[in-house]
Amino acid sequence: MTERLISMVLSCLFCQLLSLAAGTPLREGQIANIKPKGWLLEMLNRQNSGLTGHPEALSYPYNSCLWAGEISRNTESYGSNWWRYEQTAYYTDGLLRLGYLLGDSALIAKGELGIDYTIRHATADGRLCNASLGNNMWPMAVFFRAMQAESEYRGADSIAKVLERHFLGYQPKDFSHDRNIVNIEGLLWTYSQTGNRQLLEMAKEAYSLGGFALDAEAILNDKPLKMHGVTCCEMLKLPIILYMYTREEGYLSLARRAMKKLTDDHLLPDGVPSSAEHLAGKNPIHSHETCDIVDFTWTLGYFLMATGEGQWADMIEKAVMNAGMGAITKDFRSLQYFSSVNQVIATGTSNNNHFKHGSTWMAYRPTHETECCSGNIHRLLPNYVSRMWLKSDGGEVVAALYGPSTFSGTSAEGHSYTITEDTDYPFSQTIRFRFAADSNIKLPLMLRIPGWCDSYSISINGKPTTDCRQDKGFVRVEREFSDGDVVELSLPMKVKKTAWQPYGVYFSYGPLVLSYPVATLCEEDTVTYANMNGKRPENPEFKCWSMKPAASWQFGLSADARPTRQAAETTGFPFDKSQTPLRFSVDATEIAWPLDEDRFTPELKDARKLTPASGGKPQTKTIELVPYGATELRVTVFPVTEK
């Protein structure tokens, strides 16, 4: 009995040492301990009653068995053979994490059914994924994330063992081309769970072979990045994940340089790089794919965990709350494939990008010609919530991303506790952390101080405190907490003005970008477009929309324009335009800035060279700005007129 006990203790110690060996500052895997509240819970419930819970509205391939069987093609002429497995892997990951966060047994069963089927149908040598895909391992790189979610939620060591056998069925060279290289993410997670260093060495060798779009050579040269946007966002995380597990500075340098090259040349004001389908530059007329929003924020999470730097969490919040929320209708019943900071029309023929010009790709629809974004969008908010709370190597509980939620855990002494994050953030600057515990607990609490916040304050049980150490954008609050204790964090927000080339300006308030919400004529679009390959929503409650401007939107702002916040206390959902509590007024000048060809959002113009809209003396009008994420049609970057 004693020998068995010693063996168990040594085994536990080994597992602890293994998980800490790389010295990663922050770690995820807390999804079972996180519960959304407030507006986050409302949005996730809308997601469940919307597209995630109604795959028939998404049409093909989501109206299939997903990964719980064979998915047949819907057309012999459109789409590569791997598409339908990539797309349904995105969807499975999103619906499963949503199910865990909401405690929805139907979603959980549906997601786990695909995992069970995939495991039961492994090849004789342990390989997973559909046999028809041959050596295309990209869909499995996506599906791995769903398997990771189940393992972390259920504490299922068996999944790591299955993945270990799967990965060991390949050679490093098998991973080192195209998007196969993204399997490094799964390789290294599996290494962290099993301790098999062969997996680590495989990942390092595969990356060193190069030959993929964002390899070390592409990162280190002086050429700007010119590649597929989603591929870039996916491959961007690889050197930072390698750094997580090796702590080799060379990988960190590669990761930082790759991120700088991408953001310097392509990051848009809403926090996501342009990509339609390829990286497109910083002109506000350019769009980004909805997949870019989800994949970029997922990659930023690895930068956050690997470095422990709060700046990456700032970027996640900005991208999710602006670009992410702005690409969907707030009932989660339709989405855009391409979205942009300036979009004043969204119809079946309004896509202003060069790729698929004049097509459906910027319309708000449940179904799209290419189906990847319709699957990936389901990951956006579940990913955000599952990484709101992290753990550190030093035992700290880390409030990394803010929003109403609860986090439950057990202290080092074995005492249970729950922290309730009581806030309307980002619509409020006050965040209260309320402790409930069955005994006093000594717990280090890490709170992020966003880079946009010039000054912050912390109080404990109503008494201000300055006894907090700040490092890398976080403050450490360490004390013995008692049941009922409240830590209050105040993050004052101010309107910030940012110039944008070539002729523009935009405003932000805390993490939220501000936009002019264009009055909209919204009508159901019943046209079955030729590019849709016959796809229509298979649920009449889910509509394809045609959105056109119903009033003037052609405004320029003077160089000294400064929005003023208006009183707007509401109790509704804060991302609904009519309910948002954040409203700002600013004086604007009407200018001649018409649609291109009567159906495309026009490029940003030099307003100093434009005539007034009336043709005579410039007319000034007070307009209202609201959070970008509360809009569908919008102007975010305004032309600057004469002062």
Locate each region found by the language model.
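C-terminal beta-rich recognition modules with glycine/proline-rich loops and embedded aromatic residues
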Residues: A255, D314-N322, A327-R434, Q470, ...
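Low-complexity, Ser/Thr/Pro/Gly-enriched N-terminal "stalk/linker" regions
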Residues: A22-Q87, S105-R127, K204
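Carbohydrate-binding/catalytic loop surfaces
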Residues: S59-N81, L128-F143, R179-T194, E217-L238, ...
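Catalytic-core region of carbohydrate-active enzymes that cleave or remodel glycosidic bonds
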Residues: M244-D265, P284-F332, Q343-V344
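Structural helix-adjacent loops and short alpha-helical linkers that scaffold large soluble proteins
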Residues: T24-N33, G99-E112, M147-K161, Y191-K204, ...
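Well-ordered alpha-helical segments within folded domains of soluble proteins
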Residues: W82-Y100, N135-S151, S176-S192, M227-M244, ...
